[in-house]
Amino acid sequence: MIKKYEYDLCGKKIEVTIGKVAEQANGACLIQSGETVLLVTAVGSKEPREGVDFFPLTCDFEEKLYSVGKIPGGFIKREGRPSEKATLTARLIDRPLRPLFPEGYHNDVQVIATALSVDQDNTPDILAMIGSSIALSISDIPFLGPTGSVAVGMIDGEFIINPTKEQREKSDLELTVAGTKDAIMMVEAGCNNITEQQVLKAILRAHEEIKKICEFIESIQKECGKPKQEFIQPEKNIELDEEVKSFCIEDLKKITVNEDKLDREDHINTLKRSVVDYFVEKYDESIASKVSTIYDDLEKSEVRRLILEDYIRPDNRKLDQIREITCDVDILPRPHGSGLFKRGQTQVLSVTTLGTPSDAQVLDGLIEQEDKRYMHQYNFPPYSVGDARPLRSPGRREIGHGALAERALLPVIPSEEEFPYTIRVVSEVLSSNGSSSQASVCGSTLSLLDAGVPIKEPVAGIAMGLIKEDDNVVILSDIQGLEDHLGDMDFKVAGTKDGITALQMDIKITGISEEILTEALERARVGRLHILSLMNECISEPNKEISKYAPRIMVINIAPEKVREVIGPGGKVINKIIDETGVKIDTEDDGKITVAGENTESAQRAIDMIKEIVREPEIGEKYLGRVTKIMNFGAFVEILPGKEGLLHISNIAHERTNKVEDVLKENDEIMVKLMDIDDQGKMTLSRKALLPKPERKEKKNFDKKSEDQNSEDK
């Protein structure tokens, strides 16, 4: 049976259709707003996956170019690997759902959101998140939702729920929030340097709408929902738990706190092997995995107990203490800018490259095509955590971390008018013990300043953590890897001294309160200011000069109708400039021309040549022209690139010229004067006007003849 539901989200109608498509999926729905339509499905396996100790959830977002009336490029004309935007949307779907499955549930679950039709005002990401919650809620998969999701913009201090394309372009905030009726589950934001109070108000405003969306989904679930699969958590062997605990807990307590990550891991793993070996010998091999799991749970419990009860962190820091920080710049000779940022045992090298406008990344997917002139990419090689494994292309984590750091710096990147370069920053994680994405924010700032990029303000990032047991809550500043792994929250905040530029929150519990959010934001602000002060001691302002290896860019604006003259037929004119000067030239339809050369001299020479091309001839001006063609009646002379005038045979010299070839030949350079331009733009030139007038010998000869004649008469 097909059922349709409608929901009004702040003036925008959302339509949900159940039972029309994908009937073999555990749960499926069509969700529509405006002309954006998505199919969202949820499928779960009937049995748990063998040999895993994690929840195998996969969320995918499929961009179909037919949804915007496009045909894929390339030879095969088929959608390829997911775009960066699709990957980020898949992460948005995944993050609020993952904590809402029963502990110990190891069945495979796959959620797929497919964009079938997309308009520019109703972005598919929010619909995909809501549709995923609906598909899981009406399925028989044991999902503990529902969740709701909204986007929030801010224009002139006013919050806008699910802003349109035009509103997004004007907004100082790009916030995505997901949560349940009771708590916030996920936050993702890019901000134009706004305050913590404004961010918090926006999150709370979003949660008001999320509660209503959850109620809407619950009403659908009541009518269409399937009975949930019965999931019984595996019974614990209490006796074995106690036996393992009594055998190793005292030794575990002694080695839990250690400032050195690798040394701590060595001790923890050595003890674990001895514990497993002891019980395998005592019982049999089949018990090994159970003992290993019990040991891991003991380690987690001990770390959390120390923090909650004794306020002792695994590396012996105070709760709000930030690890030791070192900064360095200009460490690589050839790249255009470089910065090395180290916080504890996390170290990131960020490298900046300055390019021309044509180096900008062209984004052409479900959104309108646009150029991206600031790019940040994040790499996490295996050696950064002491692993030996094959190198692969960037995964979802790398793409997500790179996008977060990019978003953090974007508000301070100068406009193209101020700084006409394309900017690419690559952050290489050299060593990781947590907060590497925020270290890449700090490293990027150092690198950009070293490259001479006039960023508006330095940006720093910090990751906050949370340990929560019932009402006992502890917030941690600058979390390391273990605290991220065993804690309940990873809350990343980046910004300047004045406000927030990017935010990302992921939690592993069923939500956090307003009070926790408020305290976490304030603690992050204090930590961020501390980090910025240390970075400023290393470099506080952009270098006055860009690298000698960076291209020199000059910009000239000409009349739009003159662009074709600069390009010339088949690119003949522009290619000649490029060949003669060795520069790179980018033209735009609005008349903006960007010239990039290896040095200032070559770029300036190209600019001068362009000026000559677009220069308008003026009557009465003198020009050094080149003879392009000889005719019986005169010669055509090019006085400016692409601009020829007629030098009539009578205007070549004061004396009579019998044949043009007697005085001129092709490619001769001569000085001429522009005498006239007729209504059709044809130019009349004169060489004669610039030549000195000869003495009138004819008159002298006449006088002499007269004298001779008079003498004869006498």
UniProtKB/Swiss-Prot annotation:
UniProt KW keywords: Cytoplasm, Magnesium, Metal-binding, Nucleotidyltransferase, RNA-binding, Transferase
Region: Disordered, residue numbers: 685-714
Reaction catalyzed: RNA(n+1) + phosphate = RNA(n) + a ribonucleoside 5'-diphosphate
Any one Gene Ontology molecular-function term assigned to this protein's record: 3'-5'-RNA exonuclease activity
Location(s), subcellular: Cytoplasm
Metal-binding among keywords: yes
Known role: Involved in mRNA degradation. Catalyzes the phosphorolysis of single-stranded polyribonucleotides processively in the 3'- to 5'-direction.
Family per record: Belongs to the polyribonucleotide nucleotidyltransferase family.
Name used for this protein in its record: Polyribonucleotide nucleotidyltransferase
Protein's organism: Finegoldia magna (strain ATCC 29328 / DSM 20472 / WAL 2508)
Lineage, highest ranks first: Bacteria, Bacillati, Bacillota, Tissierellia, Tissierellales
